[in-house]
Amino acid sequence: MDIPPIESGAGMKIAVCAKVVPEQARRIDPETKRLDRSGEQTLNPFDANAVEEALRLKGDDAGAEVVLVSLGPERSLDALRKALAMGADRVVLVADEAAAGSDLVASSYALAQVLEREGADLILFGQQANDSDGAVMWAAVADRLRRPLISQVAELTVSDGTLRGKRQTEFGYDVIEAPLPVAVAVSDAINEPRYPSLKGIMGAKKKPQQTLSLSDLGVDADRAGEAGSRTEVYAIGEPPPRGETQRIDDDGTGAEKIVEFLLERKAL
Amino acid sequence: MSTLVFLEHHEGELQKDSLGVLGKAAQLGDDVSALIAGSGVEGLAAQAARFGASKVYLADDPALAAPLPQPRVDVAADLIRRHGFDTVLFGATVLTADVAAGLAARLDAGLNWDLVELTQENGKLVGKRPALDDTVYVDVGWKSEPRLALIRTGTFEPVESGGEAGVEQVDVQLQDFSTLATMVEQAHEESEGPSIEEADVIVAGGRGLGGPENFALIEELAKALGGAVAATRAVVDAGWYPYSAQVGQTGKTVSPRLYVALGISGAIQHKVGMQGSNVIVAINKDPNAPIFEYADLGVVGDLHQIVPKLTELVNAKNAAHFPRG
Ligand SMILES: Cc1cc2nc3c(=O)[nH]c(=O)nc-3n(C[C@H](O)[C@H](O)[C@H](O)COP(=O)(O)OP(=O)(O)OC[C@H]3O[C@@H](n4cnc5c(N)ncnc54)[C@H](O)[C@@H]3O)c2cc1C
Ligand SMILES: Cc1cc2nc3c(=O)[nH]c(=O)nc-3n(C[C@H](O)[C@H](O)[C@H](O)COP(=O)(O)OP(=O)(O)OC[C@H]3O[C@@H](n4cnc5c(N)ncnc54)[C@H](O)[C@@H]3O)c2cc1C
């Protein structure tokens, strides 16, 4: 069931939902019970696949546009520039203190408000946010926008206003079709995201970068942040104890060490 | 508690994880209803009753034949509104995650995902949730009803209690946008050859292999160890290896004596398919790869350097054990 090659998305407007996540050393702050976002931030790696797919669909069609939409703290712009450097045209960031601590209900609401304003033909999502591993956002957003939805897409084509996606489930592969405008979440196998070129990096700074507050969007404060959230965190605990794990650096004797270990564990 | 459990089914069988969640719900309270949505699904009601449902709602309609989420959101939302269930539970799959998240938006209802336990504490429902690659366990709850929860793959075993249930057909009214996505084709796996589920040793490869041709490295090591070859979704989706060899949430669940993970980051969705392995060995060049959190032996290094040598050493050991002539 090979899918025919991409036809250009003539004049298509594509919105890519991109989340900015902590680069390393992830921890939950015991005070706020939220993810500690104080360290270095980076573009959610799974969202680079969505950006790449958008750029592929856009091709060299000057009439098409790729806009990044993100909800997060103001300083997320630094990390989002990576996606601009890859080739996205502009970014709209919803940054508002009152949105901190938003759960799925609250964040999908705010995202849907921006996306409604943007009115894209195609809304792309990454496979999952690598801090929360939700892999659910698209379904909430699609419901709010009353648009068709295809998730986990590993291969996609657009032709004659219809998007066709191939995706894996627990039982094998599905091919699903939906007319534009449509919300689509891509798998991390859909493509190999490009590295930004030096020219791209230089050019990124000059691309339009808009920051909106919740009130700019007409989102009432009680629909955002903790007030707008319907889930809560009670306590943060240790994982159950598990057997000892050993980690060694390969200094050229990795193979020998593995064999020793396997013999020790009687696994050889 | 009045709980609704969404039951997924495939080829005339209710899914094992769905039944496991049903059993858990029955253990938490006695008023447990089940929703089965599909086309020609009447026959499944009795099975739901045997595994803990005291009431079964059937949404039986040709428009629900394809396993697509949005029509199921419509049906579930109507049912939940009508009966005021305070809790709605799902065994997590590709389909149910989309149904649950769609419902969260539709009903303005909290959704906690990836739960591995549910308990009642002073009348309050509390979910246990591993987070950040399972390095912390968080107790989570809901601020309002209905409370929606997705239970991690493979968490609860079904319990056959042998009960009976009242069965009620529900009206199927779909939103315009819910029927825009259509199933064009479904290719289900034909199983051929021995299944990796029975293998005693598994050598698995991920995107770190660098290309499909490098699966040869894995195959040689697997041969030396007398094992089978497995793969991650990333490489199966990319067409490097067949789906029948995939381990994880949407692939096989395996528990061999030895699992060797090569160039695999160790995502939760992979872990749920192989965490039951007796001994796990991983080679990954990234010292921060999540796989190192649960590998019994983790080697930080380049698999291209280590694996050929490892295969050679294992072959030499085999030859020493079974000398020729
Ligand atoms: C450890 C942890 C656990 C959490 N558990 C829950 C929970 O059980 N229930 C709950 O309601 N909330 C939870 N949250 C909060 C939740 O992550 C945020 O509300 C987030 O905005 C929603 O992301 P998601 O996890 O649904 O993303 P996913 O569904 O994993 O993200 C899928 C895609 O949606 C897009 N996307 C996601 N977030 C954004 C964003 N902020 N801006 C732009 N695009 C975005 C990206 O394309 C991304 O690839 C948790 C957060 C953390 C850190
Ligand atoms: C609903 C859903 C269901 C899913 N189901 C499954 C499933 O059933 N099974 C599954 O596997 N995944 C599943 N996934 C996908 C999962 O989240 C990960 O994206 C996937 O497992 C990653 O595969 P990978 O480890 O091969 O690739 P990556 O995450 O890209 O990891 C590659 C690793 O190779 C390492 N590496 C690179 N080069 C070398 C080298 N030379 N030597 C050593 N190491 C190297 C890198 O450091 C990296 O850690 C699912 C996701 C979702 C959202």
Feature-to-residue mapping (PLM):
Chain A
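N-terminal glycine-rich FAD/FM-binding segment characteristic of electron-transfer flavoproteins
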Residues: 2-268
